[in-house]
């Protein structure tokens, strides 16, 4: 199949923000006359939209570029680009490490991609500048499906957590205009979107410079703008989790009863070393408030094992917090040095790798047990499920999520993706609820 120089293919790695950014990239290129290819085999431009949060991110990119290299051998005119956080983080050295790459674009430079692609046709090109004002306001993402949508409300991060590269890859915080967010939400709801997730590195620090609106006010307005649409948001920083935000979540019925609230460690000493800006008692108090005001709320978190200077006692405090809070789920990793971060510059990576791995395994084992038990406790209940797709295992079954973000699989019957279905839970696996459509759907 011949490759079309005006067709592009985007392979997205990493977080929801990257998925939203891929939609922005596609929209900007389509405005310039490019078309999105249905497969990488027909595209004249292949872009990898990348994430730099974990150490293995570059390894994943390297593996995929080996795959792309075969395409390039057969078609030397094929253009290969890296966008997103890895180009911003590793910069022009990537041209040396990966000769197959033709162009690099950082997260603030997507508006000039058509120019960059034209330059790359003549030789390697890069745009890696930070733009403290860029929010891509006015760009409507190109979306491949209409049931769920990500809506970025801010970009960048001002929190200098010691382990994190995000401030170095996405720059300082800037918030999308209040009215623009509401316009996008309204358009999505009118098009039939059933669930909208508001995105930001730290949504809790949202601030609209014109109206003075904070995140709780924005969230309330969004939920009223799309009252028949489920509303989620991620990610929240514990230090900025306000009482007013909790009250908004409790008072609006279409805001999902799920919160991702990364804690990273159960030790106040480690939180201070991580520069998290709060202690563990503050975190506990916020969990208590959430459970008091939103009974049945589902909680998830992030946990890092083996950060610089972590002792056995610090690790045990993390396990203790997990047993106390009983998170529904967690993203769990062991610490890896990210060059340029505060930890890399000022702290020795002094926990042996085998100890990191052992501690991580203890965290994973404990969380898996808690998650499985919480799912078993749901057996016999009736939950409301937004159907997202057919089950991967069988077209006779459907898969969806509860407001608490639990995955549910049930027999299809008369239902279709996009339906909101009341499901009687009859069983569970380690990560999934199993059920059947309830007889009473009202």
UniProtKB/Swiss-Prot annotation:
Cofactor: binding comment: Binds 2 [4Fe-4S] clusters. One cluster is coordinated with 3 cysteines and an exchangeable S-adenosyl-L-methionine.
UniProt keyword Iron-sulfur present: yes
Domain MTTase N-terminal, first and last residues per copy: 6-122
Binding site for [4Fe-4S] cluster 2: 157, 161, 164
Alphabetical UniProt keywords: 4Fe-4S, Cytoplasm, Iron, Iron-sulfur, Metal-binding, S-adenosyl-L-methionine, Transferase, tRNA processing
GO molecular function: 4 iron, 4 sulfur cluster binding; metal ion binding; N6-isopentenyladenosine methylthiotransferase activity
Name of the molecule in the record: tRNA-2-methylthio-N(6)-dimethylallyladenosine synthase
Gene, per the UniProt record: miaB
